[in-house]
Amino acid sequence: MKSIRSKFMLLTVCTILIALGIATWIGVTAIRELGRNDADEMLHLTSTTGAMHIENYFESVEQSVETVSNLVQDSFDGMPYEELEAQVENVRNLFIRIAYHTNGVLTYYFRIDPEISETVKGFWYVYEEENGFQEHEVTDISQYDTNDTSKLVWFTVPKATGEGVWLPPYNTENLGAAVISYNVPVYWEDRFIGVIGIEVAYETLTQEVENIEIFQTGYAFLLDENLNLKPQIV
């Protein structure tokens, strides 16, 4: 009887241990899966929120340029050629107010195609830490083939496409600074007359990305259309 009882107790204990082992394994697996799901949801939420924040920033820059562009197009409608210089001055006074209300602007400009005028060149303003926006000498566009989209991309690309365009990171000819820019072509009597644009310091974009925090060791990055890793320019 003792032998049978001992065997029965041993079998019961083994059954309990097996049941506990299975329950523990199920519990650990469930907790691990729950943690994985929570991590996935957190990653998705963080990336979505970060992307929306950056997208909103891009849209604010676009809106600033498009606002100036639309006002310029309206003022140029029916304008005599002799008033070109005066209208450019009006744009100058308008643009500076909008630029100060757009975060991260490094430069803004309105450049006239030299095929339209050899004397009215437009303007180019650069933000300086202590002095705000200051006018700088403009690039001599007449020294370039404006049909060659590999040069002066901020001018030649919107001229070629005929629409507003974001340009990938490039170095400005005069400042040697890495920037991205949004540029819109301007027309007068259905003829291309110049480009309005804003350049944003590339550092501003990288800071927006670096501000996206994912747990303790995670990080965010961007990929361009060629799958180049950002924030570094490669």
Residue ranges and their predicted role:
Residues 106, 181-182, 217-219:
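Short loop/turn microsegments at loop-to-beta-strand junctions
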Residues 4-11, 15-86, 104, 164, ...:
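Juxtamembrane extracytoplasmic/periplasmic/luminal helical "stalk" adjacent to the first N-terminal
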Residues 29-36, 132, 207-210:
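Juxtamembrane transmembrane-helix termini
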Residues 130-203, 207:
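Extracytoplasmic/periplasmic ligand-binding sensor regions of membrane-associated signaling proteins
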